Amino acid sequence: MNETNVGLDFRTLNSRLTIEADWYYRLTQNAVIDAPLPMGAGNLLGNRGEILNTGVELSFNWADKIGKDFSYYIGANLTTLHNEVKDLNGLSYLYGGSAEFRTISQVGGELNAYYGYDIEGVYQNAAEIAADPIAVANGLEPGDFKYVDQNKDGKIDNKDRVTLGSYIPNFNYGINLGFSYKNFDFSMVMQGVAGNQIVNRKRGDRRWHSELNYDLDQFENRWTGEGSTNEYMSAKGSVKPWNISNFNSFYVEDGSYFRIQNVQVAYTFPKKDFGKFKMPSI
């Protein structure tokens, strides 16, 4: 592990305001990768990769009092992450995931990025089908997906697959706040991520499990005729191999979220004096 951290801590206004900033650089050498053996003898896990993670960590905290009974605080933090494959034992890429939900690690790209076909829309009418040699060659109909022919060779095959996103967030962030008033205390922690993608496995698993229902969004917004949608396939198309047998961008969704992680409300009962017995505060 080759790691460098540079940080700065700053306090001002009688320490009511605290700011921390850190830059980190972590190059994991001898990372475990599943690399192929010579002569097609399968794969073998080994410490032969290099993975870089770098970014900044920022935090801001403010704490103060108003009068003698009320105190409060608020804080926020942000972490950025750049993930990059630097070396794969001399290889330019390695496949991962499963045959159905393929991932790829490429030198210069992110680790285990989603890898499949990019959808640019839905065929809307017969004229559009007739004008597209790819649609004609594959017997497509209105309501079927239109894949991007990445290399412009007039067909859709493995050479048209591209990275469709990564499960690794570019940003992690959080907010915490609270206050105390006499015997009452309140605190809240919120947290979120952004810049990552997730795979909707339920949509993908319908390829093998026809008893699974559509999700509500897909059902309500399915293609029902020209101009109805350019994002969802038709009901008929949802069982056609062209649309569902290849891992594509339809299964990849935004993984960003923001949530309230914890809320706490407390009351501290004051001490009570019962003669010789004194009950502590609770």
Model regions: which residues?
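Outer-membrane beta-barrel signature, preferentially recognizing the C-terminal barrel domain
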Residues: 1-18, 44-67, 107-116, 166-171
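Residues on the lipid-exposed face of transmembrane beta-strands in outer-membrane beta-barrel proteins
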Residues: 6-10, 21, 58-62, 175-181, ...
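Transmembrane beta-strands of outer-membrane beta-barrel pores
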Residues: 23-29, 62-64, 78-84, 181-183, ...
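Extracytoplasmic gating/loop element in the C-terminal half of outer-membrane beta-barrel translocons
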Residues: 193-282
